[in-house]
């Protein structure tokens, strides 16, 4: 009996062992136990059973002892137990792949019989191994794996021990069965050491890894009829891992992996070429299966339950998975490598990498285009990737169809080919290569082929991770800070969302046929990642990686390994980013200011980076529109060589961009042009990475400050969010590729008309469509077709081409704000980054031993409009200049007029804004036709009166003539539109008045008086309130009277000063506002309340008044306008004024809280009556804390280019127009809350033929031609041309304090050229005496001026060499400045005046004669004298008007009003 059983055992075991004889078997038949000793297993059989890769071969397997226990009576429910004591396996690597594995002996155990009882018993065997030692010998290293307490056993679908009958799920209808196995071990020890050799002593650092308990879960799906395995699912689960690696161990690991990479790659290609055809699950049940399962017909419910259970655990395709719950990896420097410490900037450093829930999935046999919903960790990221990959496949299918058609056309036009010329395999695959779409054209030589396009995918998921900053022994004991981390929790993102998702897919045909295949694709998703710049960590990593790369190069040279990397092969790449954050910190100083930020964070909401054109905002049409925007700017033209660019500047708009935008760089385009012979081979449609054009799109991109104590942990905005597009190409690599292409493939470049007729027609239709939709755009091509690609194929890199060309396009208006402490932080960060960059460069040179490769980069930036707000320290209100009248109190006016007047003026502003003469210095010009009076504020940005009003806005000091006129029933409606203008309409006449921007709020000389002249309709006033002799009111059908003049502060803009109408806002010019009296008022949004008109303001000086007079003068123009239709005499007007005083507190369009803040403003200026604002002191105290003096620079038409040539850097910047606005003291909270954010300002403010500001900055060795110091500190050149602006001296002083640095600034050599520039300066500094006169505004007109700064820091100021002598220029400028201090006289010989202060001809150009200069100087002197006379006369009349006004006020007081 025992002999018979031994023979049966030998029959089955002989397939696995060698030299097995019956005497080696000890068997106890009744007990069911047996024992074998010194077993030598068959290597080839084990290779087939384990399905080892062909780059690995088993050379020997030995087992010292094996025992078996068979439960004879319970074979259906209990497994056979096989125990092995110690197994030793020796393996070796193969440089060339060995023969493929044969069929598994388990599958053939029963002679290819059906799945029966014997197969179930064998399948359920439990194997236990005390110790397994695997030794692997490779060319460059030896490795060993030691596993202890290994167990292999069957489990149920929930991975639990149980009855063997529940360890399988059998579906007779499908003809398939699922079995579940689990393999676990107590410990695994991995060790790898370099091959012992005399010349490899430096690479002998052993690599060791010890893991704790782990397990593998295996799910097998077999066919019932032949027991063949259809699909396998293998999951390797590792618990927490801690691995410490020194730099030498990491080098060894990289070297070992590199030595195996070539063999692994060859083996992978072999596996793909011999991959099995994917099999479909059988839906038809065989008769034999029905015989075996007779109960299925009687139990339909049970059958349905089995089918459902089978579907729940079905393995649709083979896959392998690695799951690591937590991995801590520590990389540190070698402690014993003392010879390297002297070369390291950071010695003894260590970095910790912590990964949570790391999963790696591998799907080797996935049918291309099929659904992935059955994958193990299917998510939204997988769904997005599938949609993108399907678009790529669809494009590939279309290209294959066009390629087939091109081959047919070529064959028809050529002599008949031999039958063997056209591959039957290729012709048939016209049907098979397409995964989805329309039916294909029948092939000429059809032949069956079962090959389908397959894909191999690797998916990496990382739920959370932290890469900490480098730490050293010198640092104090503290928890390390994160350098790269995930912010899912702080952003409240779903926990199931992966921090990093990466999926790489390759395509192949199972039979290895030579047919076009798509390019591999890589999809990556980054969610809520934060990168923090740490100087020590970057320096340490840089040296670490450089050392690693250098040792790897040495290793490859020793073993003569080829660099088989496919870096030049194109890979379709897409990277999606969600809530990415880049943080640049600074050193925290003790005792810093509460407004001092500690970090700058650069963030984006959504980001897409791709080299394909199948992503939103990254398509060919988007690039075409962007190229058109750049081409519309002459600055980016190749022929533009004027300053700030030069003849050596790169050609930013490279032809690669234009060819790619019009899809002229594809393989199919070259086929149609005749440059490539159409062939159906593997690489026909593949391209090189050198042809890639990258697109990066940020839907929202913004920059914040963080870490301020005053911010209470909240970020403060620096640059408001805006969309950003970036396009990148590589001309140098493309040129090298074209050279290789021409060398390898000498193909004629002549294009046949027949081959390109379809393409030319398509492009012609595209051009006609573009011309139809954009008639004003510049033609993109010459003639009726696109530029010929033949010429571009012969393209070679020139000096005007950089290695990398970058186009940066900002699509919206950019708004920025910065205060002094934030400015200091930016200076510190700039210095730190420059120092870090220089240190990295020197480290690279030290490790490599030679200078780093010189890379050239060209970056172009296009920005339509921007706004920079300087948040300066608030001006002390008590230091503001006050007139004697203001010392005794000033009357108040309500902040708002009726809202309905705003629409009236807005329409009038649009009608008359462009046709009136532009006046810059408070010159009120009433036209002689008695129908129109206009003062243009075309340079004044928009103002929302709801947000910014000073006390002077409510300060109305009325003269006698004004009160007399109030009694007239012809008081017109007054309103203020977005440009702070005044429109008056009465009868058939209309009046449009736009105030000046140059008046000081507290100025005692800035008074305006209403005047009337007999027989004339012209009224002229200067900045000091001086006027022509008064006359009677104008009569007739024109204007009834002029009843007020706006003071400068009435026209000043608010925070953002952006109009609701972008076109009108673009036509505004710079105002000047005294910040000392500007306070912040709360305001409602424009949607809640329309813009209110500004109150009229007429101020006088040298007139002291009592408190009662001040109270009397506190009038509401809202009331006056509402009752302007009332028929009354002069006495009735006094009654109306008295009623208006009572209505001062309840202004329309204002909430109670806003009213408090509004009226509280007047107290801070020291001009308001205490009685008028006594109830509002609390609101004033609240607003005082966040007051800032704001100066806004509105920038229009920004064109920039950055050229980098190795260490040389050139920055060229061109600004079309700069418009400063001085808002004075405003509430920071209200300013930030009410300014428009991200508004698209497409209109350009007064397009100019030449930009106002051109700037060029150079640094590096190439800048030595300008100055020796320029190599280090840089050299700045700036040209300012045709620039006109206005500034208050307080604003200039405040900006000076803003720019002050805490340290001594480095000397930067520079050269500044100023030409045809006018700056109006208003001195609003406090006077030493209250009776001193306010200085008159001074206009500085600079025709030609050069300012140079040398290396020693000294400045040199000189005039242009175009002037023969400096005397004429000096005299001319002097007289011109005198004249421009008054904006009064109307020079009748020059009717077409275009500037407010221009009362004489412009200073002649240098090309004009000297005689003309003399004549102009004489005219200026005459005008100066005329202005002086007018000024004296106006002062006398002003004093008389003050006296009359004071008398009238006393009369009103006696009347009890």
From Swiss-Prot:
Keywords: Coiled coil, Cytoplasm, Endosome, Phosphoprotein
Domain of life: Eukaryota
Segments of this protein annotated with the region Disordered: 267-295, 409-449, 975-1038, 1056-1099, 1145-1183
Keyword Disulfide bond attributed: no
A family per Pfam: BLTP3A_B
CC terms in the record's Gene Ontology section: cytosol; early endosome
Biological processes per GO annotation: early endosome to Golgi transport; intermembrane lipid transfer
Annotated Chorein N-terminal domain residues: 3-94
Entry annotated with the keyword Magnesium: no
MF-aspect GO terms: GARP complex binding; lipid transfer activity; protein homodimerization activity
Compartments, record wording: Cytoplasm, Cytosol; Early endosome
InterPro entries, per database record: BLTP3A/B
Coiled-coil blocks: 1410-1455
Bias-annotated ranges (Polar residues): 278-295, 980-995, 1145-1180
Residues recorded with modification Phosphoserine: 414, 418, 774, 934, 1008
Assembly and interaction partners: Homodimer (via N-terminus). Associates with the Golgi-associated retrograde protein (GARP) complex. Interacts with GARP complex component VPS52. Interacts (via C-terminal coiled-coil domain) with STX6.
Cited function: Tube-forming lipid transport protein which mediates the transfer of lipids between membranes at organelle contact sites. Required for retrograde traffic of vesicle clusters in the early endocytic pathway to the Golgi complex.
Protein known as: Bridge-like lipid transfer protein family member 3B
Taxonomic source organism: Mus musculus (Mouse)
């Amino acid at each position: 009996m025992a002999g018979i059983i031994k023979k049966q055992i030998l029959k089955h075991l002989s397939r696995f062992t060698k030299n097995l004889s019956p005497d080696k078997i000890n068997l106890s038949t009744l007990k069911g136990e047996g024992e074998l000793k010194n077993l030598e297993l068959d290597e080839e059989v084990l290779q087939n059973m384990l399905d080892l890769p062909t780059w690995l071969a088993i050379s020997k397997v030995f087992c010292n002892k094996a025992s078996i226990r068979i439960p004879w009576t319970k074979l259906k429910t209990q497994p056979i137990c096989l125990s092995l004591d110690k197994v030793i396996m020796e393996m070796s690597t193969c440089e060339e792949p060995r023969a493929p594995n044969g069929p598994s002996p388990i599958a053939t155990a029963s002679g290819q019989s059906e799945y029966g009882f014997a197969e179930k018993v064998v399948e359920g065997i439990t194997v236990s191994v005390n110790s397994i030692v695997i030794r692997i010998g490779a060319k460059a290293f030896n490795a060993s794996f030691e596993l202890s307490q290994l167990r292999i056993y069957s489990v149920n679908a929930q991975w639990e021990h149980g009855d063997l009958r529940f360890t399988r799920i059998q579906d007779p209808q499908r003809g398939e069965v699922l079995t579940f196995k689990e393999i676990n071990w107590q410990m695994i020890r991995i060790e790898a050491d370099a091959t012992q050799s005399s010349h490899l002593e430096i690479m002998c650092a052993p690599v060791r890894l010890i893991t704790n308990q782990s397990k593998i879960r295996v799910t097998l799906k077999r066919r019932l009829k032949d027991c063949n395995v259809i699909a396998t699912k293998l999951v390797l689960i590792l618990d927490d891992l801690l691995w410490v690696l020194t730099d030498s161990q990491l080098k060894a690991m990289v070297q070992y992996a590199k030595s195996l990479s070539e063999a692994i790659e060859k083996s992978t290609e072999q596996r793909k070429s011999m991959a099995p055809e994917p099999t479909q699950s059988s839906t038809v049940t065989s008769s034999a299966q029905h015989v075996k399962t007779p109960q299925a017909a009687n139990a339909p419910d049970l059958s349905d339950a089995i089918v459902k259970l089978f579907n729940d655990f079905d393995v649709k395709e083979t896959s392998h998975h690695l799951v690591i719950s937590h991995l801590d990896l520590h990389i540190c420097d070698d402690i014993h490598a003392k010879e390297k410490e002297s070369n390291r900037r950071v010695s003894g450093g260590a970095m910790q990498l912590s990964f949570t829930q790391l999963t790696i999935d591998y799907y080797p046999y996935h049918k291309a285009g099929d659904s992935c919903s059955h994958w193990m960790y299917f998510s939204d990221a997988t769904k997005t990737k599938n949609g993108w990959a399907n678009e790529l496949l669809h494009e590939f299918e279309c290209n294959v169809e066009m390629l087939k058609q091109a081959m047919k056309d070529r064959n028809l036009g050529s002599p008949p080919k031999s039958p063997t010329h056209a591959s039957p395999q290729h012709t048939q695959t016209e049907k098979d290569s397409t995964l989805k779409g329309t039916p294909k054209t029948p092939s000429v030589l059809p032949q069956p082929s079962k090959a389908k396009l397959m894909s191999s995918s690797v998916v990496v998921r990382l739920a959370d991770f932290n890469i900490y900053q480098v730490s050293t022994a010198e640092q104090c004991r503290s928890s390390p800070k994160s350098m790269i981390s995930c912010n899912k929790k702080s952003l409240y993102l779903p926990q199931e969302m992966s921090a990093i998702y990466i999926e790489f897919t390759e395509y192949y045909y199972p039979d290895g046929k030579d047919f076009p295949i798509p390019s591999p694709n890589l999809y990556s998703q980054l969610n809520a990642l934060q990168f923090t710049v740490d100087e020590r960590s970057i320096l340490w990593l840089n040296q670490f990686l450089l050392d690693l790369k250098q040792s790897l190069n040495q290793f490859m040279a020793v073993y003569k390994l080829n660099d088989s990397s496919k870096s030049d092969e194109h890979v379709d790449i897409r990277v999606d980013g969600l809530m990415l954050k880049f943080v640049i910190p600074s050193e925290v100083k003790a005792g810093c200011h509460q407004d001092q930020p500690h970090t700058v964070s650069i963030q984006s909401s959504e980001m897409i980076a791709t080299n394909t054109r199948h992503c939103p905002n990254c398509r060919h049409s988007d690039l075409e529109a962007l190229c058109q925007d750049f081409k519309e700017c002459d600055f980016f033209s190749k022929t533009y060589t004027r300053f700030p660019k030069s003849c050596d500047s790169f050609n930013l708009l490279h032809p690669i961009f234009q060819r790619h935008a019009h899809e002229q760089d594809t393989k199919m385009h070259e086929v149609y042009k005749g440059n490539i012979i159409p062939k159906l081979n593997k690489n026909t449609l593949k391209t090189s990475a050198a042809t890639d054009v990258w697109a990066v799109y940020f839907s929202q991109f913004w920059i914040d400050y963080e870490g301020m104590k005053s911010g209470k942990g909240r970020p403060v905005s620096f640059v408001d969010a805006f969309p950003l597009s970036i396009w990148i190409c590589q001309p140098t690599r493309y040129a090298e590729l074209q050279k290789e292409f021409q060398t390898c493939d000498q193909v004629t470049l002549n294009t046949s008309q027949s081959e390109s007729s379809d393409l030319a027609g398509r492009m012609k239709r595209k051009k006609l469509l573009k011309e139809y939709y954009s008639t004003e755009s510049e033609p993109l091509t010459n003639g009726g077709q696109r530029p010929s690609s033949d010429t571009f194929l012969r393209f070679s890199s020139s000096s005007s081409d950089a290695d990398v060309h970058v186009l940066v396009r900002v699509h919206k208006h950019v708004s920025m704000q910065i205060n002094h402490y934030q400015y200091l932080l930016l200076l510190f960060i700039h210095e730190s980054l420059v120092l870090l960059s220089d240190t990295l460069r020197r480290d690279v040179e030290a490790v490599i031993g030679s200078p780093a490769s010189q890379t050239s980069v060209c970056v172009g930036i296009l920005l339509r409009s921007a706004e920079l707000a300087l948040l300066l320290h608030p001006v002390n209100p008590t230091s503001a200049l006050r007139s004697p009248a203001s010392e005794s109190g000033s009357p108040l006016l309500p902040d708002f007029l009726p809202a309905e007047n705003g629409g009236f003026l807005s329409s009038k502003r649009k009608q008359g804004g462009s046709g009136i003469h532009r006046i810059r210095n408070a010159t009120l010009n009433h036209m002689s036709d008695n129908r129109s009076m206009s003062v243009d504020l075309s340079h004044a940005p928009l103002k929302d009166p709801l947000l910014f009003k000073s006390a002077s806005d409510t300060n109305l000091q009325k003269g006698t003539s004004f009160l007399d006129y109030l009694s007239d029933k012809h008081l017109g409606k007054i309103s203020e539109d977005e440009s702070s203008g005044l429109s008056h309409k009465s009868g058939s006449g209309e009046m449009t008045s736009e105030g000046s921007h140059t008046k000081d709020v507290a100025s005692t000389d800035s008074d305006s008086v209403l005047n009337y002249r007999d027989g004339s309709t012209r009224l002229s006033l200067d900045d000091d309130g001086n006027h022509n002799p008064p006359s009677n009111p104008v009569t007739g059908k024109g204007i009834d009277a002029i009843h007020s003049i706006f003071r400068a502060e009435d026209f000043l803009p608010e925070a953002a000063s952006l109009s609701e109408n972008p076109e009108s806002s673009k036509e505004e010019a710079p105002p000047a506002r005294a910040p000392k009296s500007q306070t912040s008022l709360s305001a409602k949004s424009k949607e809640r309340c329309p813009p209110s008109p500004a109150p009229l303001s007429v101020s006088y000086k040298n007139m002291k008044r009592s408190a009662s007079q001040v109270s009397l003068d506190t009038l509401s123009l809202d009331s006056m306008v509402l009752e302007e239709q009332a028929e009354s005499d002069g006495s009735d007007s006094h009654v109306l004024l008295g009623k208006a005083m009572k209505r001062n507190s309840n202004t329309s369009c204002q909430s109670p809280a806003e009213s408090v803040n509004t009226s509280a403003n007047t107290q801070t200026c020291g001009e308001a009556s205490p009685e008028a604002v006594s109830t509002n002191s609390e609101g004033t105290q609240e607003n005082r804390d966040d007051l800032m003096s704001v100066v806004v620079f509105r920038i229009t038409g920004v064109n920039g280019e950055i050229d980098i040539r190795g260490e040389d850097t050139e920055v060229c910047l061109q600004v079309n127009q700069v418009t400063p606005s001085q808002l004075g003291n405003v509430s920071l909270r209200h300013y930030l809350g009410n300014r428009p954010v991200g508004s698209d300002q497409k209109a350009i403010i007064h397009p100019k033929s030449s930009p106002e500001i051109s700037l060029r900055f150079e640094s590096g060795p190439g800048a030595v031609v300008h100055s020796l110091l320029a190599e280090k500190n840089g050299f700045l050149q700036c040209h300012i041309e045709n620039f006109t602006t206005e500034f208050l001296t307080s604003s200039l002083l405040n900006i000076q304090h803003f720019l002050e640095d805490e340290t001594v600034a480095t000397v930067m050599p520079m050269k500044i050229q100023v030409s045809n520039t006018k700056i109006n300066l208003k001195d609003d500094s406090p006077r030493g005496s209250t009776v001193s006169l306010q200085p008159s505004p001074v206009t500085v007109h600079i025709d030609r001026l050069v300012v140079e700064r040398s290396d020693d820091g000294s400045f040199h100021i000189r005039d242009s060499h175009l002037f023969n002598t400096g005397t004429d220029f000096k005299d001319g400028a002097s007289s011109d400045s005198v004249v421009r201090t008054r904006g009064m006289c109307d020079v009748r010989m020059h009717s077409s005046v275009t500037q407010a202060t221009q009362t004489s001809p412009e200073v002649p150009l240098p090309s004009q004669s000297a005689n003309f200069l003399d004549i102009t100087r004489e005219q200026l002197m005459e005008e100066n004298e005329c202005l002086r006379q007018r000024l004296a006369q106006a002062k006398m009349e002003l004093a008389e008007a003050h006296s009359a006004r004071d008398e009238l006020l006393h009369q009103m007081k006696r009347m009890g009003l």
